């Protein structure tokens, strides 16, 4: 933040003094001295901070009248204009670096630029997703485009790494050897605080042979708590220099002896004097703000001395003049193919297609078969539809949909979504299937890196790729933290970015013989733990739901920048494709509406309630027993729940026609998921008591063959029949119980 404030202030002062537009930076983009007040403060509090303390018209704070005070997150975020990632969870930003670099290879940018430079330290690199970067970057062969500046200061917050977490006797724990063993191009610096050594390393990397596809890392020995004016371990000749993890500033008090000693060296170096720091801590908020801003101005006044500010702005302008936006890339950067009308649900072909695709690099043509929908009775589970929607997406977008799966590409049916095979930056840059290790966190981080880039010079338009990372549903929580931080970045981004996809393949108890470690019952619920409307979660039960439901979500996400994630849940088994002519809603593309009616109430007969069904085996078995329910005189309305988010996008009239508000109090759920989280919100107080879910007895399932596991989950046909019979027979009791609860208020 300090660096960006210094640069912003230098330019602002020069523009004010000269009026020369070469020095102008939009204050809504620049960081200014006033923004130091925003460090670790929220935007809401900053909006009224000065007014509440009687400082709104104080001359020290006049800069705030330009555009307020910028909130500077405690861990740097992309909104700060300092980073292309959101920081916070250790290593979360650098984990995306391989994907960012690979994007520019995919779009055909020269190896001379853009380049991706990542900064990280040794403690953060012990984090799992950060460690996985080592494999990710080499697998993607990003070469010199990715340059990691690795600060080895052997200091965290609570301890040292070597000699602390790792005992000193294990002297073979070598950070340099770790990077080398992963195949990286490794450089070392004896003193990472020496600018000459750092610049020499940067120059070496810049001049390196672009044909060398090893990613680069510079490991420099640094000092946490480094200060340039130290003599014999003392600051200002009086205080011991505090280094290592004890120097973490959180515990330092305002205007403490050590702080004053540090400030004194700055005063002596630049001939300035800070205000009030030798009178101890300031307890009055108003006076503390005044002292703080006054001393920020003292520091910034150095820009007016000895031509320092003039040198800095001329250097910044010269650098800015070298930035070009006319790089030759493989595709049109002014057109967003994800908004192509062929991707709209209404325009999806219902018959199998045989399309001709042309490799824009090699010129080779070939034909590709795509079946977005299948005939009733054909045997095909929902996972079979995944490769087809990816193929259609790549056909329409000219191979702009990238997939990474944790050594499961064939198994979870993303393998054949690539029209041109596996990606290789040199031999097959148009391949969209990235070969990936079993690194769920690393894979999703790479996918995030890919979708976070855009070649468009218009911040309102997107010119990039979409990406999907997939694994067993049970393992997808490993992807959650990177995806959560990505969602936060996407929410506030000043630039239109791509859409991250999470594929929870082999979800539900249907994973069966793999054992309960692989059941995606509870695990997949994490994909609902986002602000409403910022993700779209899809849970498919029938093959013909997949294309309609997915492209409805894609149609929204391509046009609403708030939607940064689409998560998809499918199960392993192959079932006969449903005959929708027998449904109340016969629309082949009904899944696009989120919820749709499988069976409506029979007219002229007593109603027994609403059933919301979700998941493959649960819904297939429920649909199969509908004739038996009718024979028994049970009159229920059955609603398939594909996506609550898609349902929310429908008109109120449609929503009420499917599930009127009162239905929540006369409703049960049949789901392969969990009773801890329902397919829709605001269900009634007795929903839990009558619903059928995989955790019906609040126990982990065991395992076995698929029919055995489904029976244990009480989602087999007979269990579903008995559960619905109980629900229907108890209707009067259910409703009376709820009435009594209300009357007791």
Give each language-model segment a name.
Residues 1-117, 294-575, 640-645, 651, ...:
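Thiamine diphosphate
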Residues 122:
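Active-site glycine-centered loops adjacent to acidic/histidine catalytic or metal-binding residues
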Residues 125-129, 476-479:
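Active-site-adjacent loop/helix micro-motif of nuclease/hydrolase catalytic cores
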């Amino acid at each position: 933040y300090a660096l960006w404030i210094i640069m912003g202030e230098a330019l602002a002062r020069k523009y004010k003094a000269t009026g020369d537009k070469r020095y102008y930076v939009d204050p809504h983009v620049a960081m200014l001295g006033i923004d130091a007040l925003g460090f670790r403060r929220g935007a809401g509090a900053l909006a009224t901070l000065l007014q509440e303390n009687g400082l709104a018209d104080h001359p020290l704070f006049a800069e705030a009248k330009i555009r307020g005070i910028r909130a500077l997150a405690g861990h740097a975020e992309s909104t700060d204009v300092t980073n292309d990632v959101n920081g916070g969870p250790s290593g979360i930003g650098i984990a995306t670096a391989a994907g960012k670099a690979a994007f520019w290879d995919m779009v055909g940018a020269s190896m001379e630029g853009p380049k991706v430079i990542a900064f990280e330290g040794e403690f953060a690199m012990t984090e799992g997703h950060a460690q996985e970067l080592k494999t990710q970057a080499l697998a993607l062969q990003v070469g010199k485009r990715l340059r990691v500046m690795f600060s080895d200061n052997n200091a965290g917050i609570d301890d040292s790494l070597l000699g602390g977490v790792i005992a000193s006797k294990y002297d073979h724990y070598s950070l340099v050897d770790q990077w080398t063993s992963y195949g990286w191009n490794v450089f070392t610096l004896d003193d990472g605080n020496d600018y000459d050594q750092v610049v020499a390393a940067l120059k070496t990397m810049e001049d390196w042979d672009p044909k060398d596809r090893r990613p680069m890392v510079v490991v420099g020995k640094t000092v946490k708590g480094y200060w340039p004016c130290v003599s014999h371990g003392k600051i200002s000749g009086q205080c011991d220099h505090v280094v290592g993890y004890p120097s973490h500033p959180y515990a330092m008090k305002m205007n403490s002896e050590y702080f004053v000693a540090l400030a004194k060296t700055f005063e002596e170096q630049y001939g300035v004097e800070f205000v009030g720091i030798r009178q101890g801590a300031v307890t009055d908020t108003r006076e503390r703000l005044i002292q703080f801003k006054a001393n920020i101005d003292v520091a910034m006044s150095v820009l007016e001395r000895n031509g320092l500010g003039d040198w800095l702005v001329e250097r910044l302008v010269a650098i800015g003049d070298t930035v070009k936006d006319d790089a030759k890339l493989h595709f049109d950067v002014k057109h967003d193919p994800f908004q192509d009308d062929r991707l709209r649900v209404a325009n999806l072909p219902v018959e199998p297609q045989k399309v001709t695709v042309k490799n824009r690099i090699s010129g080779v043509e070939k034909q590709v078969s795509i079946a977005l929908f299948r005939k009733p009775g054909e045997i095909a589970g929902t996972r079979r539809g995944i490769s087809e929607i990816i193929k259609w997406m790549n056909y329409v977008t000219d191979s702009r949909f990238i997939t990474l799966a944790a050594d499961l590409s064939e198994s979870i049916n993303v393998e054949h979504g690539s029209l041109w095979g596996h990606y290789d930056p040199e031999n097959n840059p148009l391949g969209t299937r990235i070969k990936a290790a079993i690194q769920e966190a690393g894979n999703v981080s790479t996918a995030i890196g890919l979708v976070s880039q855009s070649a468009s010079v218009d911040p309102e338009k997107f010119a990039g790729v979409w990406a999907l990372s997939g694994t067993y549903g049970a393992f997808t929580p490993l992807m959650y933290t990177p995806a959560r931080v990505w969602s936060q970045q996407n929410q506030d981004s000043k630039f239109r970015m791509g859409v991250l996809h999470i594929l929870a393949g082999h979800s539900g108890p249907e994973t069966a013989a793999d054992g309960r470690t692989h059941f995606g019952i509870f695990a997949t619920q994490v994909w609902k733990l986002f602000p409403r409307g910022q993700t779209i979660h899809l849970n498919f039960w029938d093959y013909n739901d997949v294309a309609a439901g997915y492209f409805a979500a894609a149609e929204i996400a391509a046009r609403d920048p708030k939607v940064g994630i689409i998560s998809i849940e499918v199960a392993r088994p192959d079932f006969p494709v449903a005959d929708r002519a027998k449904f109340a809603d016969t629309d082949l593309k009904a899944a696009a509406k989120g919820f749709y009616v499988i069976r409506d109430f029979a007219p002229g007969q007593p109603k027994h309630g609403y059933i919301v069904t979700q998941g493959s085996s649960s819904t297939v078995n429920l649909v199969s027993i509908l004739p038996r329910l009718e024979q028994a005189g049970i009159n229920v309305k059955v609603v398939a729940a594909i996506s609550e988010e898609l349902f929310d996008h429908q008109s109120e009239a449609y929503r009420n026609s499917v599930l009127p508000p009162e239905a929540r109090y006369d409703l049960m759920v049949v789901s392969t998921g969990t009773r801890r989280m329902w397919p829709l919100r605001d269900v009634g107080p007795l929903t839990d008591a009558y619903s059928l879910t995989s955790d019906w007895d609040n126990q982990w399932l065991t395992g076995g063959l698929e029919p055995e596991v489904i029976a244990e989950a009480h989602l087999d046909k007979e269990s579903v029949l008995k559960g619905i019979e109980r629900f229907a027979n108890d209707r009067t009791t259910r409703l009376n119980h709820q009435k009594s609860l209300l009357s007791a208020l």
